[in-house]
Amino acid sequence: FTIVDARGHWLAMTSSIEDAFGSRLMINGLLMNNQLTDFSFVPELDGLPVANRVAPGKRPRSAMSPTFVLTAKGKPLMSVGSPGGSRIIGFNTGVIARWLQGEHDAGELVSAPHALNRNGFTELEHGFPAERRAELVARGHDIRDVDMASGLGVIVRTANGLQGAADPRREGQAAGY
């Protein structure tokens, strides 16, 4: 999620207990996470240690990447964040790319169809433009049609103030006071 307060302080944050309801265990009213599933349970590959192996005191790798876009003087222009596991970086990068290409409407930024590649086949969401799909196929992409519930949250600075939006694919909303 992303927040701007009345004093102009910005916050972009991703919080997770991994799966929906985490480990499905509750202690004193708090759901316990299952973040250990983010580790690789194969400690070695080809005789070499795997970077994301389980070890005491280690934290698992994460794609969480709440992001700010700033002016040259450090003034926030946009903040974006999303849940979504290993797809998070692609979700956030898609919003930033659309913003850099001139789309500054917060609702359009978070609701556009996703296209992601996580070092394998290319995932396209329903509604992805057919002509762009054809370009990817022509370049040799192995295309898979998938549903993607990103849950993006974005705030953009416009000439008229701030505009926020929440991804319509998940529960969430933008609010201003």
Please give the residue ranges for each predicted region:
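Proteins synthesized as precursors that undergo proteolytic processing into mature forms
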Residues: 1-146
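Cofactor-centric catalytic regions
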Residues: 127-177
